[in-house]
Amino acid sequence: LLDSEIFNTNGYGTHGMMLLRNRFFKTCAFNTNLQDWFFDNDITQVSRLAGYTTARDIKDIKLVITESSVKYFKFMPKDMPFEQKCKRFLDALYEGKNSSVFGVVKADHDAPLMDGMMAYTNYQLLNTIGLTREGVGKLLEPSFEYLQDMLNRSPFLRYQINMTTDHATIAENEVPDLAKYRRDTVLDMSCRTPLFEQTEFYKSFRSDTVRYFKERLRKGRIAVSGNYQVLFGNAYEFLWALTDESYEPTFSFSLDDGQVCTTGFAHGEMVLCARSPHITMGNLYLAQNAHCYDLLRYFNLTPNIICVNAIESNIQQRLNGCD
């Protein structure tokens, strides 16, 4: 759990998670309102926190991790006291300095289509959801309509070009790439005059784009409403464990069995979840989306994050060993 202040001051305020790396350290840190949690539960002293910290003021708590994030512990004697392990790790991390720089490997990001509202399927998913012939037709219907719009309306073709390619202005000393030149020409000229759509240049490019789109469909790359989301397991229970040393995770405070929480879908909506990759139909998880107040209060969730419950649940096995 990483305090929202760190996200905001380092240019990641719009993100819900960052994958952090340091010396023998890696963790997936989620955007958390730690100070709000401390305030709401009247926690003003670090002595009331479970675990180990070198902080002297509760306002200095910025990052909360579990032992699994510290790979340095693997190289220490098993019988060494936990506090001594932490001190050795911090000595190696800071090397006598007052600060240590963490690397951000990646952060959550929107789905590639329709401003983050749609993503592509793959053959693995399509082969495990048990589609009938009628179901396949219904699934492909929006793609066929989009395909027809590309043939008939230039704005749709321009959107397809922008969506599938990164294009930039050719520098004076750069050798022009033919494919890039064709894309940029179509983007520019089709905006200037509708007469350009009658040229062989435009028609040839449109045919190639449509052919590429069809090939993607044959490979199982179908645009659907959804996203590739980051799993956040038992977030609210993590906060309880932080402030209650006697806490035992015997049940979920935030989510009932068969519920998930994501801002990417409406409250009460049924969502089909699957890990990528997965193996069989048994790896699919049909859940109800619940906008839990406690999760939305203490965590700055983006539509790219989904909160799940693994307490007294087989979700980790069902989703093919997800973590």
Regions found by a protein language model. Name each.
Residues 1-321:
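Conserved small-residue
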